[in-house]
């Protein structure tokens, strides 16, 4: 079944193209960042996020990640600037992580794998609907934040505490009054390139903003992500401990840096 993709050997990233041919396309994500090959582009502006904490609605476990969903029916929580030519609406954020602290991020920087990677997914309302934006090369903007291991991050704990309500696949719970900009690093420097979703159908519609500076969370906090299950409540328990796609070929794309 096409919709039964996952991260196991039989349905994992190596098989996605069998059902979703674009997964072998020319603009796939994630990628390896080699900083010596990336040039500073002085035309790249600063970016800003103005998020309404009341637009957060629910948190859910879809068996592949945990996701927080936002009200995107109007311009409530917006991303502006950077490489973007228009304001984009926040729709959801989710994370990718690994089975241990030494890996889990999808993008890598000079060979460094971080413990996890946060993706904030926004869409361009000039295309009227999210579905319409998925069909456009600049329809979606994703801010990627790396998580490294160190001291605990209190703001991240607010989110983690809600995971107890969505332990198993298919669970959903109210989750509001949360401003995800509290999960951004102090430094707003970023790399940008044209890419895709890192999960099927792997549509090539994304302007990526990858933040150079990781945020620091504790080992226990990342372990909390691994306490989720990819199985439903009535099924034999399968821990959700590996949900990252490996880097894809750059195929001539240019990565630009907002900083020197």
Swiss-Prot record:
Residues 3-259 form the Alpha-carbonic anhydrase domain. Its EC number is 4.2.1.1. The modification Phosphotyrosine is found at residue 127. One of its GO terms (molecular function) is carbonate dehydratase activity. The modification Phosphothreonine is found at residues 73, 129, 176, 216. Residues 64-67 are annotated as: Involved in proton transfer. It catalyses: hydrogencarbonate + H(+) = CO2 + H2O. Its main location: cytoplasm. Reversible hydration of carbon dioxide. This is Carbonic anhydrase 3. The lineage of its organism: Eukaryota, Metazoa, Chordata, Craniata, Vertebrata.
């Amino acid at each position: 079944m096409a919709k039964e993709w996952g991260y196991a050997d039989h349905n994992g990233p190596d098989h996605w193209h069998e059902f979703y041919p674009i997964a072998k396309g020319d603009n796939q994500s994630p990628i390896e960042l080699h900083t010596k090959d990336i040039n500073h582009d002085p035309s790249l502006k600063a970016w800003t996020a103005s998020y309404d904490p009341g637009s957060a609605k629910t948190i859910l476990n879809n068996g592949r990640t945990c996701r927080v969903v936002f009200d995107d029916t109007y311009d409530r929580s917006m991303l502006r600037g950077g490489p973007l030519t228009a304001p984009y609406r926040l729709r959801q954020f989710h994370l990718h992580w690994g089975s241990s602290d030494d890996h889990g991020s999808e993008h890598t920087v000079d060979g460094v794998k971080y413990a996890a990677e946060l993706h904030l997914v926004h869409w361009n309302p000039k295309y009227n609907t999210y579905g319409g934006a998925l069909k456009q090369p600049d329809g979606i903007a994703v801010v990627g934040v790396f998580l490294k291991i160190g001291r605990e991050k209190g703001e991240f704990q607010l989110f983690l505490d809600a995971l107890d309500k969505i332990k198993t696949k298919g669970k959903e719970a109210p989750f509001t009054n949360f401003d995800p900009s509290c999960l951004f690093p102090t430094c707003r420097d970023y790399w940008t390139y044209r890419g895709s979703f890192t999960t099927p159908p792997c549509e090539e519609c994304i302007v990526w903003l990858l933040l150079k500076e990781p945020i620091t969370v504790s080992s226990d906090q990342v372990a909390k992500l691994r306490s989720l299950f990819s199985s439903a409540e009535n099924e034999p328990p399968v821990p959700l401990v590996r949900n990252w796609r490996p880097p894809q070929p750059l195929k001539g794309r240019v990565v630009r840096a907002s900083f020197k």
